């Protein structure tokens, strides 16, 4: 990804797990991101989409698992995750929507 066309092309989805949910109290959020994106692009995309200030971005490449099917073996897609820490004093990101 040479240039950012749309920030929503970089941030694909939030990661919903026990571990990522526990980190929400510390203003740390986890997202599935485009595999070719870098930390700078992820930071700019988060700041544009959610209007927050990002302190740091850590990334992790997750290798796709080999899975057995009826006809042999297949492979799940490899993914990239970004662990985003918000700056102190920044408003929290509302991932799940406020109750009506």
Curated annotation (Swiss-Prot):
GO terms for biological process: translation. InterPro entries: Nucleotide-bd_a/b_plait_sf (IPR012677), Ribosomal_uL23-like (IPR013025), Ribosomal_uL23/eL15/eS24_sf (IPR012678), Ribosomal_uL23_CS (IPR001014). Pfam families: Ribosomal_L23. Keywords: Ribonucleoprotein, Ribosomal protein, RNA-binding, rRNA-binding. Gene3D superfamilies: 3.30.70.330. The keyword Ribosomal protein applies. Belongs to the universal ribosomal protein uL23 family. Part of the 50S ribosomal subunit. Contacts protein L29, and trigger factor when it is bound to the ribosome. One of the early assembly proteins it binds 23S rRNA. One of the proteins that surrounds the polypeptide exit tunnel on the outside of the ribosome. Forms the main docking site for trigger factor binding to the ribosome. HAMAP family: Ribosomal_uL23_B. NCBIfam families: PRK05738.2-4, PRK05738.2-5. PANTHER family: 60S RIBOSOMAL PROTEIN L23A. This is Large ribosomal subunit protein uL23. It comes from Mycobacterium marinum (strain ATCC BAA-535 / M).
């Amino acid at each position: 990804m040479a240039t950012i066309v749309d920030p929503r092309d970089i941030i694909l989805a939030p990661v919903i797990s026990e571990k990522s949910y526990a980190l929400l109290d510390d203003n740390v959020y986890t997202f599935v991101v485009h595999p070719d994106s870098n930390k700078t692009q992820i930071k700019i995309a988060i700041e544009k989409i959610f209007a927050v200030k990002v302190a740091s971005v850590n990334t992790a490449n997750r290798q796709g698992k080999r899975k057995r099917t009826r006809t042999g073996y297949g492979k799940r897609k490899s993914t990239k995750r970004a662990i985003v820490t918000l700056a102190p004093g920044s408003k929290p990101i509302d991932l799940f929507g406020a109750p009506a």
